């Protein structure tokens, strides 16, 4: 049995991995995001993820991005491992960071996202979209297959907010053991009220849904997709419910979605507090790839925490594993490399 389902057989000639790095002040709401030891430290998570993915360690951030209470290491360890094993080209894209990493980033000149309980959550949505589209057009002649991931703490809450504004009622996943759905719903209700919105009222205005309830990662990914669209490039959105929300936005914008797929981890799919697969069916996602790193067989306790639901996805981990599968890398090879990355970081023990 393959560790990527459905099994991928056709290796692309010119793949590329992109990771959009963003912040939303929605993550500052206590107990909402577990993508960092404290709500304040979530500001550093995307920068730390980028430094880790690029160099194998953190450089400028004060602490390795981890999830309490067991200090489970960030999913960026999986992305780092896949990029190292495949040697695939990659780029990081700054779309509204509070803290910028000490590694090269393409800057879309986006502002960090505001708390969605404010009337405006994302400023200059159209401008960010256009700049990302221009970037996609610049890159499209270099690739035939692109995997786009994200790192944004609080992103599952903004995803749920956007989905509700578009008319989709569903629970989203979480980076925590216990999904704080009650808190998320309360925050979203307050956000809808602050913007004068009701369920499904923005189904014909997806850009406004981002401006009111979203985060700056969303217009960046949508713009990239638009930039790649007019060519034969296959696009994989790497993520769980956040990329399902991005797909919904793309669909409501009227884009062609035939060459789009989503790749995520087994941990998102098996999250009983969410309904990821049902949501992708409702949205009509053409293909969903599910990666299983097999961390239950690992000697590291921190990796075992993934098996129990602590952290499920992030930093494009599912898509990066999908990419590793395309290169013919086995689950055992991949897990061994993740353990090596953790040992160098002294994480996950």
Curated annotation (Swiss-Prot):
| CDD domains the UniProt entry points to | DMB-PRT_CobT
Q: Which SUPFAM superfamilies match?
A: Nicotinate mononucleotide:5,6-dimethylbenzimidazole phosphoribosyltransferase (CobT)
Q: Which GO terms describe its molecular function?
A: nicotinate-nucleotide-dimethylbenzimidazole phosphoribosyltransferase activity
Source organism's superkingdom?
Archaea
Q: Which residues form the signal peptide?
A: none
Q: Which family does it belong to?
A: Belongs to the UPF0284 family.
Q: Which PANTHER family match?
A: PTHR38811, UPF0284 PROTEIN SLL1500 (PTHR38811:SF1)
Under which name does UniProt file this protein?
UPF0284 protein Mbar_A0178
């Amino acid at each position: 049995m393959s560790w990527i389902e459905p099994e991928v057989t056709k290796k692309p000639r010119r793949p590329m991995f992109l990771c959009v790095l963003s912040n939303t002040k929605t993550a500052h709401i206590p107990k909402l995001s577990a993508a960092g030891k404290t709500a304040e430290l979530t500001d550093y998570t995307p920068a730390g993820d980028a430094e880790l993915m690029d160099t194998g360690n953190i450089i400028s951030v004060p602490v390795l991005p981890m999830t309490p209470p067991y200090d489970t290491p960030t999913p960026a360890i999986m992305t780092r491992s896949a990029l190292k094993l495949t040697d695939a080209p990659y780029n990081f894209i700054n779309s509204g960071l509070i803290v910028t990493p000490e590694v090269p980033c393409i800057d879309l000149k986006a502002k960090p996202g505001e708390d969605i309980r404010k009337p405006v959550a994302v400023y200059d949505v159209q401008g960010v979209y256009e700049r990302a589209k221009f970037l996609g057009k610049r890159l499209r002649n270099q690739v035939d297959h692109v995997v786009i991931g994200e790192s944004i703490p609080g992103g599952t809450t903004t995803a749920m907010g956007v989905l509700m504004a578009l008319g989709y009622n569903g629970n989203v996943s979480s980076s925590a053991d216990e999904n704080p759905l009650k808190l998320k719903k309360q925050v979203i209700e307050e956000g809808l009220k602050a913007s004068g919105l009701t369920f499904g009222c923005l189904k014909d205005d997806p850009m406004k849904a981002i401006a009111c309830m979203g985060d700056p990662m969303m217009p960046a990914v949508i713009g990239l997709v638009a930039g790649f669209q007019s060519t034969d490039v296959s696009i994989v959105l790497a993520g769980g419910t956040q990329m399902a929300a991005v797909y919904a936005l793309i669909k409501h914008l009227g884009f062609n979605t035939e060459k789009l797929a989503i790749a995520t981890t087994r941990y998102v799919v098996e999250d009983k507090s969410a309904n990821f697969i049902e949501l992708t069916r409702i949205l009509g996602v053409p293909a969903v790839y599910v990666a299983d790193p097999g961390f239950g067989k690992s000697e590291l306790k921190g990796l075992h925490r993934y098996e129990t639901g602590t952290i499920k996805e992030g930093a494009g981990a599912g898509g990066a594993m999908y990419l590793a599968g395309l290169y013919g890398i086995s689950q055992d090879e991949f897990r061994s490399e993740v353990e090596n990355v953790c040992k160098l970081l002294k994480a996950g023990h």
